[in-house]
Amino acid sequence: MKKLLLIIFLAFTSTGFCQLKSKSFEEVDSLQYFQKKKIIVFIHTDWCQFCQRMKITTFKNKEIMEKLNSNFYFIDFNAELKRDILFNNQTFKYKPSGNNVGVHELALELGTINNQIVYPVLCVLNDKNEIILQYNNYLSPKDFKLLLEKLEQ
């Protein structure tokens, strides 16, 4: 019985050591002064099924978590967040569009492709906070790893 409990404990703790470290926009603004890195912003909503799927598959992949933690600044951004965000010397606000419905201005700024926003959105910024890539679709762990490899070059 003790061996079984030990095995279960080790199984849970060995996978728990690697966690994806998400930053805020404000943190990244400050961190860029000390170490320049590309910023990967995952723009999602709570109701988006593909967004939730990426959270439990792509962003739980150990290799992906390690690459994101060491080579990039990662921001997990809910497009329906209702607080103001100061980023790149500009304040972005939540824009209500009905009863308990709306979208954050920063999500629109970073996630709009061809005049529309479709979730999930992956937005990559260079170290000067300029958009270098936008992608609005589900990315499997395999495809996301390929993207990270290209971004690391």
Q: Positions of the model-derived regions?
A:
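Thioredoxin-like thiol-disulfide oxidoreductase module
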Residues: E63-I64, Y73-V121, L125-I131, L151
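N-terminal leader/targeting and pre-domain segments
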Residues: Q19-Q35
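Bacterial Sec-dependent N-terminal signal peptides
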Residues: M1-K21
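Short active-site neighborhood of thiol/selenol oxidoreductases, capturing the structured segment around
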Residues: F34-Q49
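Loop/turn elements at helix/coil->beta-strand transitions in domains of secreted/extracellular proteins
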Residues: Q35-I39, S70-Y73, D127
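C-type cytochrome heme c attachment motif
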Residues: D46-R53, V121-C123
